[in-house]
């Protein structure tokens, strides 16, 4: 396997672990934390879930907590459940999270108040460099 492929295959775990590090730095209890992942599709503004690396982020986070919500207005939730066994919501939950990971830069996320989605010392991690730097605790 090529080095580029190996690097790409490890990116999901890397993102999850970087988010966990940000949470630890801010004193957020990781065990049983509530985490919101924004987006699960392979790319933005598209319903295709084939080859998505967001699944790897999800499964790495499961080592720490099972309180993970995936919100994606583009994904077919039945298809995601069938392919990956992950429950996806197409409606943004009105809850506060310990961490929010912007994984896919859907246009619906452009006007989203991400700071309003996290608890007082919650973490925002931006995988796509989509959000204003002042709003995020970490980015890829």
Where are these regions (language model features)?
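Structural/interface elements that position substrates and couple domains in central-metabolism enzymes
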Residues: 1-140
